[in-house]
């Protein structure tokens, strides 16, 4: 339980046997260090048989973005404790409001995704709960960095791999601007026109299944952030509320 090498403890019992009290005294003396286990990340697993032993295979190069993102994801998954909570939200009124947007010049309907509203809601939540807008990158010193800016990361699935650009100062932008910037960031990522610095310095990340479907999932926190918001697809359903189905 204490990690003590019992051979280093002087026993006080007959024939040098070590008692529980001897171990406690040894620990209290602080004259030793508990050996830390060596953890090797990405240790190569050896296959007993080659894949080609069972049929035809094709060897492909992994795109650079995917190789880089896999290292970041592995680091996040192994170093950040993950606790996941699933919940549902009624977005009936949000959808009515979102689909009512029209262009003031042409009168045509404006296409604004639900993600723009979620970004705005997240920034309000971060202001109310600032610990979620932080990074714990100095854990040994017992310090955390609480950010005073609101740069929301948006997970973008591209042919090159997963990228997470930051929508800067989201708290100071309206829904129209957020919506247009979301499209701009997505296009820049898919065309590999995004500046490297724009992939860093985030407050919290949003990742959405809206494009591919799926209700619940467990996304990996984007280090050095401390939380991530996973959003499933929206759907119509009947619920029992106030004694009746609605």
Model-predicted regions and their roles:
Residues 11-12:
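Catalytic-site-adjacent helices and loops of nucleotide signaling machinery
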């Amino acid at each position: 339980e204490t990690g003590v090498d019992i051979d280093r403890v002087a026993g006080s019992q007959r024939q040098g046997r070590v008692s529980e009290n001897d171990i406690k005294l040894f620990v209290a003396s602080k004259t030793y260090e508990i050996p830390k286990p060596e953890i090797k990340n990405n240790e190569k697993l050896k296959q007993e048989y080659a894949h080609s032993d069972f049929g035809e295979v094709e060897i492909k190069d992994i795109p650079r973005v995917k190789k880089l993102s896999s290292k970041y994801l592995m680091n996040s998954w192994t170093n950040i404790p993950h606790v996941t909570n699933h919940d549902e939200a009624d977005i009936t009124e949000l959808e009515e409001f979102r689909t009512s947007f029209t262009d003031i010049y042409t009168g045509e309907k404006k296409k604004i995704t639900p993600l723009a509203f979620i970004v705005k809601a997240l920034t309000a939540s971060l202001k109310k709960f600032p610990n979620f807008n932080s990074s714990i990158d100095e854990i040994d010193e017992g310090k955390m960095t609480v950010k005073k800016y609101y740069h929301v990361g948006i997970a973008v699935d591209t042919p090159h791999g997963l990228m997470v650009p930051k929508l800067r100062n989201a708290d100071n932008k309206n829904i129209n601007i957020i919506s247009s910037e979301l499209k701009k960031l997505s296009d820049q990522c898919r065309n590999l026109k995004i500046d490297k610095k724009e992939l860093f310095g985030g407050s919290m990340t949003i990742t959405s299944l809206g494009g591919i479907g799926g209700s619940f999932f467990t996304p990996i926190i984007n280090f050095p952030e401390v939380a991530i918001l996973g959003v499933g697809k929206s759907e119509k359903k009947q619920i029992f509320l106030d004694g009746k189905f609605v």
